């Protein structure tokens, strides 16, 4: 029985993790649960899971929790939520909290000696230079929950340090891969939230549409697998059946295929080395299957290009990139920014940098705050 602490239980990955756990009661048990402010859903999760420890970061939302199961200790506030990431009884901490805020939970889990099942992209995008050395120092274990990195992990025989020639990360291209520049100027939030193949949260769905998300995944792969950026290639694959591939020195390419469902990488990160049947993942080979790949030309997806430039520059610049992206996407979803201006805001913020060597978590917090202020200033001037 794997004992799990789930951080970010009310988001898209968090909800699917709860389903995986409830569908496998003989394999998994959630002993600690934390979320930000979605008190209604959190209340239901408390009743279904009956964790030993639970916390809502938002103290006002926590006041609306009406029923706490017997045996559950419920707390409120950011420190209480952070404590769930190092909860003593947990074997595995799955960090599904969104945004830069997820980094502090990942660091807490690593420092507590927990297995880190990582769904939060920003942990490695912003803090990879801190996180990976810390894992090595602590003798820790990190397991990817992103479908692309889980696919690579599987192709490498579950060995993050296995040798390879090249990593091939697939991308659907998002909802607007075939739109003209003129059509893109008319994109609304409602249009952008309809992803062609994946069911995801709002922020990551917009990042998929701009392809910023794929740039993040390249940065994550660099840190997770020790890959030079020249050995990572992103390719368009509209069908989202091949989740990533690994090319080896002899020319062989190994791929991982399944129907698009996040439940597969979730249950694998929790259950490794065992596998379990996953609802919705199985392909039907009694029917014809076809899929395609095509290169991503520079200039087609400006946010992707900016992300790659930031990746190669390194240091604190990926943290600036992420902060600008979070602010720009929030403004777009709120109706305060055009879809095509997301890239303008990100580029303008990144150009004001700086790209400093990553020294500490506190430095990254300062970088994040500074970049958010710059992005907000740029949005106000548009």
Annotate the PLM regions.
Residues 1-382:
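Catalytic, metal-anchored helix/loop core of enzyme active sites in primary metabolism
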């Amino acid at each position: 029985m794997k004992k799990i602490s789930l951080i970010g239980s009310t988001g898209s990955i968090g909800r699917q993790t709860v389903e995986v756990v409830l569908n496998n009661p003989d394999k998994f048990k959630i002993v600690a649960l934390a979320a930000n402010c979605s008190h209604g859903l959190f209340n239901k999760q408390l009743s279904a899971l009956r964790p030993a420890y639970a916390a809502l970061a938002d103290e006002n939302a926590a006041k609306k929790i009406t029923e706490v199961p017997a045996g559950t200790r419920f707390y409120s506030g950011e420190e209480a939520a952070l404590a769930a990431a190092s909860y003593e009884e947990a074997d595995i901490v799955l960090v599904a909290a969104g945004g830069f805020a997820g980094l502090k939970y990942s660091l807490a889990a690593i420092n507590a000696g927990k297995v880190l099942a990582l769904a939060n992209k920003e942990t490695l995008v912003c803090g990879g230079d801190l996180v990976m050395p810390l894992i090595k120092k602590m003798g820790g274990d990190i397991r990817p929950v992103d479908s692309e990195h889980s696919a690579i992990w599987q192709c490498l025989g579950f060995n993050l340090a296995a040798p390879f020639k090249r990593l091939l990360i697939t991308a659907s291209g998002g909802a607007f891969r075939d739109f003209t520049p003129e059509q893109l100027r008319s994109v609304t939030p409602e249009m952008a939230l309809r992803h062609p193949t994946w069911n995801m949260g709002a922020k990551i769905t917009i990042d998929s549409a701009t392809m910023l998300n794929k740039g993040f995944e390249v940065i994550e792969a660099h840190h997770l697998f020790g890959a030079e950026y020249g050995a990572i290639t992103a390719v368009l694959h509209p069908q989202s059946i091949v989740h990533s591939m690994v090319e080896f020195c002899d020319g062989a390419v190994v791929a991982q295929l399944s129907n698009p469902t996040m439940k597969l990488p979730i249950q694998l990160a929790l259950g490794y080395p065992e596998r379990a049947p996953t609802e919705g993942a199985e392909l039907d080979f009694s029917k014809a299957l076809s899929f395609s790949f095509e290169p991503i030309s520079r200039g087609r997806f400006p946010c992707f290009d900016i992300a790659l430039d930031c990746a190669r520059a390194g240091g604190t610049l990926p943290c600036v990139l992420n902060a600008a992206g979070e602010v720009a996407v929030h403004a777009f979803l709120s109706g305060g920014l055009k879809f095509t201006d997301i890239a303008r805001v990100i580029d303008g913020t990144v150009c004001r940098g700086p790209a400093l060597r990553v020294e500490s978590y506190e430095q990254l917090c300062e970088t994040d705050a500074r970049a958010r202020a710059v992005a907000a200033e740029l949005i106000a001037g548009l």
